[in-house]
Amino acid sequence: MGSMYRASKTLKSSRQALSILFNSLNSNRQNPTCIGLYQAYGFSSDSRQSSKEPTIDLTKFPSEKIRNFSIIAHIDHGKSTLADRLMELTGTIKKGHGQPQYLDKLQVERERGITVKAQTATMFYENKVEDQEASGYLLNLIDTPGHVDFSYEVSRSLSACQGALLVVDAAQGVQAQTVANFYLAFEANLTIVPVINKIDQPTADPERVKAQLKSMFDLDTEDVLLVSAKTGLGLEHVLPAVIERIPPPPGISESPLRMLLFDSFFNEYKGVICYVSVVDGMLSKGDKVSFAASGQSYEVLDVGIMHPELTSTGMLLTGQVGYIVTGMRTTKEARIGDTIYRTKTTVEPLPGFKPVRHMVFSGVYPADGSDFEALGHAMEKLTCNDASVSVAKETSTALGMGFRCGFLGLLHMDVFHQRLEQEYGTQVISTIPTVPYTFEYSDGSKLQVQNPAALPSNPKYRVTASWEPTVIATIILPSEYVGAVINLCSDRRGQQLEYTFIDAQRVFLKYQLPLREIVVDFYDELKSITSGYASFDYEDAEYQASDLVKLDILLNGQAVDALATIVHKQKAYRVGKELVEKLKNYIERQMFEVMIQAAIGSKIIARDTISAMRKNVLAKCYGGDITRKKKLLEKQKEGKKRMKRVGSVDIPHEAFQQILKVS
């Protein structure tokens, strides 16, 4: 009884202690020291639902009090830092929040220092004008990626905006992605507000950059804002300029509901969360909505804004940007660019977007064949957050079951693999990246090939013509490196289209290049020969006729389908020799000899051999007849022949990784 009494007394005192702790936490939720404790016990200090604060009243912001704008720039010109400062200025996040680049939420974004996924934040701002009462505005900011591979992400984000801040580094000036993003915004009829950032740098030259903006884009230099997002210098002029220059969203509040779906992501608990821009009408929680592309109907379970986290508001009005939750379980039902409307109403669908065009294809296989199901689940979840990846199942005789994936570029592919590893713990093997080719055969049929292994080697189907995709590449660089860059482009089978001077120090080059020549190491090579000063961007162009051949890699006479690639005939020998050398360096020695060959059809163009490990079978023969030793050596030789005939060669994961780097 004594022990039971003590246990009961201890339990009672523990309950009292927990009750006091939680009461204290609830009464001090705004206290910074208590917020950490509150979160440690599994409560969210940012939960708008459980907070006693009144919900945000969006009816105070008619469309004329709304501005939707995006920040666009070349990579590393300070987009995300500027977004941080603007959110601090409006009180959306606290100053010194301890998380630089707040909108870069992915681990891969923080590690690489780049923006991969466009993010949205709603800000509330009191605009004070002289001799007038302060007026409240709702500002929707969209931070976009800067790398060429994610230009599709930028174009989607711009569709929800009426204006854009074009940010340019005061030291580096106009770069290739600055040009590309400017024309994306220009084609979308957005109002462009030029911003020169990093004016606090010792090498900053704002006047030179102003002249570049004038010569390249015909922008008025009087309209350029000079700021430093790092120190806050000049930031007080940015939001007033947004309000004055960028028009409010067009739209009719009395019209039937029409919303543009411009992005989506998957949440483990809520399902698919859709980012929408309300073009006409209004949406309330509980409404029934339909998706024009699929025809599916759903009930709106939650609706709100990003402030900067998901904040439920119960409604969205004309011109506003926010999110909706419908209980959807897969993003395949939420097609980007789709029109969402109220069920049982008839509306004119919105224009939407161009379909995504995949530039690079690669096979993705589990490092351990037994992990195929786990890899499938991981890829299904990840593609819910990255709808620009195409996935189809495929089988390889060397690697087993896997997936053929289409990506927007090599960085996109690299980021996808890194996210698979970091977010889902899966180890994968990637095959050589290829681009989609078109082949015509002797019987007149045409075939588009994304996987080299799918190209028939049957002599009956002789290839009579072939075409490869090309791109229009834009390169901006210092004039002293022009010769080296022209040589690089010529080596990559490029055709020069334009050569102009931006100013006395910088040159603008435009080339038509085969896509295959730039997907692997062109950007790295360009940065290397220009000491990192060149910038590069490209856009799709037409297919052009080319002399293409299928290059097979054979191990002991057996073709390995996962190592096959398609190359230009002029480069076949060099690529084959390089592949053979890399495989020799990374395949471990076996008990039998391994012959590595590169072949075009039946013609061997490169060969090397990995010698066998040799066991000393004569170790125990201390003298005796020489015929005994010869007999043992012959027996060993026959065994190695038999082993070579039936043995399999293990190709390590590192070998596949190195082969990816062969241009």
Swiss-Prot record:
Chain's role: Promotes mitochondrial protein synthesis. May act as a fidelity factor of the translation reaction, by catalyzing a one-codon backward translocation of tRNAs on improperly translocated ribosomes. Binds to mitochondrial ribosomes in a GTP-dependent manner.
Location of this chain's protein in the cell: Mitochondrion inner membrane
Organism: Arabidopsis thaliana
Keyword Cytoplasm in annotation: no
Classification via SUPFAM superfamilies: EF-G C-terminal domain-like, P-loop containing nucleoside triphosphate hydrolases, Translation proteins
Enzyme Commission number(s) from the entry: 3.6.5.-
Highest rank taxon of the organism: Eukaryota
Any one Gene Ontology cellular component term annotated for this protein: mitochondrial inner membrane
Protein name in UniProt: Translation factor GUF1 homolog, mitochondrial
All copies of domain tr-type G, residue ranges: 64-250
